[in-house]
A protein has these predicted regions:
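Non-catalytic linker/capping segments at the edges of enzyme domains
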Residues: 1-12, 87-169, 237
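Residues that cap or initiate secondary-structure elements
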Residues: 7, 60, 77, 149-151, ...
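Short strand-loop-strand
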Residues: 12, 16, 135, 204-206
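HotDog/MaoC-like acyl-thioester-processing domains
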Residues: 70-122, 219-264
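Short, low-complexity cationic-aromatic patches
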Residues: 19-22, 60-64, 168-171, 213-217, ...
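Accessory, usually C-terminal, subdomains that scaffold auxiliary metal cofactors
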Residues: 9, 155, 198-201, 206, ...
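Hot-dog-fold acyl-thioester-processing enzymes
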Residues: 1-42, 148-197
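Hydrophobic beta-strand-centered segment that forms part of the acyl-chain substrate-binding groove
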Residues: 32-74, 184-227
Length: 264
């Protein structure tokens, strides 16, 4: 696994060694599922991600040259499907809903990761966000988000999970935006600068998608609430709980941590 140069930086802009991300922990089991279903001779195009549960290891996984993926796939043609296992040292559960299409067949070669939504096509959307309002009493931040499709690639074919809705928002789009919103609501609630927060890292995330994927381009809103921010140790380690709801029907609950005053 490789990340582009400058993928991970500190608050001061200094480069850091990248580590396995929560986005990878969602994507890799779905890539496995796409391959399994392809080998069975069916299409998962109308199968969507309904929920995901991620639990991190005690330390970040930094050996990106060797990321073990162990996934168990359980379900039937009508769905739902459950993917359970580990990615690196993260424990992962993904629930997929929707029926397979046994009449639309693809070869294993056609479902190479880069040809699927979660294998690579999800990168063809970009989201810009605008902070609309902060409510200090409830520690809630409201944001407006605009997700666009790369017009140069709009005709590019893709297969795999959620390809029937393409181009559309994926849970990856939501996780990326929610991470940014979490950083902002913590900074606003504690009257601290982003730089003084150091690195914010995930300890546990639960994401639920109540509706079918929202087709892009789309404008949507979210509400991010800081439920808890308490200092655990004298070195500035903070334990954080946040929850978020979006107009797209996606909700996120997360346990996070950061060390106040750390910049790397």
């Amino acid at each position: 696994m490789r990340y582009p140069a400058g993928w991970s930086t500190g608050a001061d802009g200094a480069l850091r060694n990248p580590h396995l991300s929560t986005l990878d922990a969602v994507v890799l089991p779905i890539i496995v599922f796409d391959r399994v279903i392809s080998e069975l001779g069916s299409s998962p195009g109308r199968v969507r991600v309904a929920a995901a549960r991620l639990r991190s290891g005690a330390v970040a996984w930094t050996d990106l040259a060797s990321v073990p993926v162990a996934v168990s796939v359980n379900g039937d043609e009508a769905g739902p499907w459950e993917l359970t296992g580990t990615v690196g040292n993260m424990r992962v559960f993904v629930r997929l809903e929707g029926a397979l299409d046994p009449h639309k067949r693809h070869t294993v070669a056609s479902l190479a990761p880069a040809a699927t939504v979660y294998g690579g096509a999800f990168r063809q959307t970009t989201t810009s966000s605008r902070l609309m309002r902060f409510e200090p009493e409830s520690r809630t931040l409201i944001g407006e988000h605009r997700t666009k499709w790369d017009a140069k690639r709009i005709r590019t074919e893709a297969e795999g999970v959620e390809s029937a809705w393409r181009p559309a928002l994926t849970v990856i789009d939501h996780l990326a935006v929610m991470g940014q919103m979490a950083q902002s609501v913590i900074a606003l609630s504690t009257d601290a600068s982003r730089e003084s927060m150091g690195t914010l890292w995930m300890r546990a995330i639960d994401i639920d998608a109540a509706e079918e994927p929202t087709v892009a381009p789309a404008t949507w809103t979210s509400r991010m609430t800081l439920l808890r921010d308490r200092e655990l140790r004298s070195d500035g380690l903070h334990d954080v709980r946040v929850q978020s709801t979006a107009s797209t029907g996606v909700s996120v609950r997360a346990s996070l941590a950061y060390t106040k005053g750390a910049s790397s």
